Amino acid sequence: MKGVIFCLVVLLWRQAWVSSKSHKCDFTKEKYLLSGEKEVSCEIDANPSDDITFICPNKIDSLCFHTVNISKNINQNKSTMSIQDLLYGSVVYGNTLFISPYVRTNTPFYCFCNLDTVTIQKFLKINRFLKDDDELSEADVMKHLKGGNVSEAQADEYLNKALNRFKKMKDLSKFFNDQADNTTKLNLPKSLNIPNDILNYDVYNSSNNRNDIVVKDEVTNKQIISKRGIMSVFVRSNNNVIKGCDFGNNNKNYFSHPISVAGKVNNKVCKIQGKPGELVGFKCAFEENGKVEPPNCFDQVLHKNKVTDLKTLIPGYASYTNKHSSKYPYYLKIPHFVNEQYTIQCKCKSNNSQNEYTFELDIQPGESEVVLNSFKTS
């Protein structure tokens, strides 16, 4: 019975997110660090509503993703552009970009990563410190499982290691995505317990960062050379207008309900109906000092005029927001099962304290089309 339940969960999980995909370019990986090429590339072919994570020890030029390079030639003048100008409706949070659900034209852009010899040595040490020496490779695990000679204790051990590894990856991803703003240097969480001599390796050895010094990796004996990492992204277009409200911009028409905040009206309400499985959202008027209430919408929302944790109403939702800036849109992926109808709100507060714009979402009960189609027989 457990096996049937597990398979059903996996099936639903895979089909639930079939419309979006996560991409990552991680230039701290050994294949990039130990490459003998002066340029190393990571190419991403993305669609609207996908997310992209850019992990780089030392970013060059634009910090990605608040601004990105629109030319592969880093020396070209005026080659950077704000992500809101290039892909309106996208959200940047930490080292991750959630691509706008509506992209009008095919859009390429680039991010660059500086990998000098000292930085490379530092991250090789970090990678090797974090690697669990007694951890079996995925191939070894599958070999044991297929052989049928795995005891229950060994199976539990494999499962625990997999869960621990997943937790470590999840915690690290959360740390990267919760960063207040992208910076040139890559920060690492204290929870990894990386020794200070490794964390500060680049500080202690900065004088050795010279092209005339031959450096070899202490483990593989491969020569280490300085190089540039290039993340090349190609985002494909679509024709899906975003279901939601855009306060303060009635010209772009990226959202289904573009609303101008011009004039003397101090309070406007934009009402949207959302069904299970749908992605909905809103964007406040662009103001550097504007704010949203509750501050961590959609994790918290206004329900019956009270601040409420959304997970108590519709567990299983997903939100895409920048916790440190209200200039980006706020998106909510409604879960595929909703028990009952709920009406929730988030408010955009203007610099002028008298101005308030309300996003009101009427969440309908039931099951999503993905779930319903999963149980249909051909």
From Swiss-Prot:
Report the gene knockout effect. No visible phenotype. Parasites grow at normal rates in vitro.
The UniProt keywords, alphabetically, are: Cell membrane, Disulfide bond, Glycoprotein, Malaria, Membrane, Repeat, Signal
InterPro entries on file = 6_CYS_dom, 6_CYS_dom_sf, Parasite_Repro/Invasion_Surf
Question: Which residues are modified by glycosylation?
Answer: N77, N149, N182, N205, N351
The answer, when asked if Manganese is one of the entry's keywords, is no
Q: Does the keyword Disulfide bond apply?
A: yes
Q: What is this protein called?
A: Merozoite surface protein P41
Q: What is the name of the gene encoding this protein?
A: PF41
- The main location is other
